[in-house]
């Protein structure tokens, strides 16, 4: 388009900011160097750690049994593979061989959003042991932060609203408080130690499935 001498020449178009999730994900997935303890005798095994008293190279046998104790399926993995990671293979094999399976009973290590969703979506029931929530030491109990499903917010022990902020890449919805309110909160030391005076509460997008597992735990049938 022609322009007068007094006019400034057109500026080159600004480069559009790329907001595609693939590129963002690629930046997040840059490989990081980490140290792995490996056995020189048997490199295929893994370092099994249980608390602070037990550390040894080992294999784990992830076993599924029926109500009478008969073994239905076993999957062997290195000792550093978590139970919840090995669950899919064991579960898929058992349900393929025994499709009539209705209820899955497991310990608290298997109470993850993914496993809960997988089992209930298959039309089965998952009943797990109690899993203690991870909360700040010496702080408010977890149950004092109440989720309001209708307004999609969290109510703190001081009856203030934590509004939805974002959903992180791990599938957790983050609810954050208003720092202006938290600054003068009488129980802030029991709630958060963040420098910006913001309390963040996370709730997984599949939390409803975990609550179904809790309901099954309180049901005598399971």
Regions found by a protein language model. Give the residues of each.
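Anion-binding and metal-coordination hotspots
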Residues: 1-222
């Amino acid at each position: 388009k022609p322009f007068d001498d007094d006019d400034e020449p057109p500026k080159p178009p600004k480069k559009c900011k790329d907001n595609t999730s693939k590129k963002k994900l690629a930046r997040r997935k840059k490989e990081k160097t980490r140290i792995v303890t490996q056995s020189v005798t048997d490199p295929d095994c893994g370092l099994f750690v249980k608390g602070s008293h037990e550390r040894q190279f080992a294999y784990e046998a992830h076993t599924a049994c029926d109500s009478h104790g008969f073994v239905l399926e076993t999957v062997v993995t290195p000792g550093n593979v978590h139970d919840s990671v090995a669950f899919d293979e064991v579960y898929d094999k058992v349900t393929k061989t025994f499709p009539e399976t209705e209820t899955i009973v497991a310990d608290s290590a298997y109470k993850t959003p993914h496993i809960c969703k997988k089992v209930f979506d298959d039309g089965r029931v998952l009943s797990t042991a109690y899993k203690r929530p991870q909360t700040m030491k010496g702080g408010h109990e977890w149950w004092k932060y109440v989720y309001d499903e209708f307004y999609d917010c969290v109510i703190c022990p001081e009856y203030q609203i934590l509004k939805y902020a974002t959903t992180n890449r791990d599938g957790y919805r983050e609810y954050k408080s208003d720092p202006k309110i938290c600054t003068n909160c009488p129980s802030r030391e029991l709630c958060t130690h963040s420098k910006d005076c913001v309390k963040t509460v996370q709730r997984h997008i599949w939390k409803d499935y975990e609550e179904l597992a809790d309901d099954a735990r309180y049901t005598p049938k399971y």
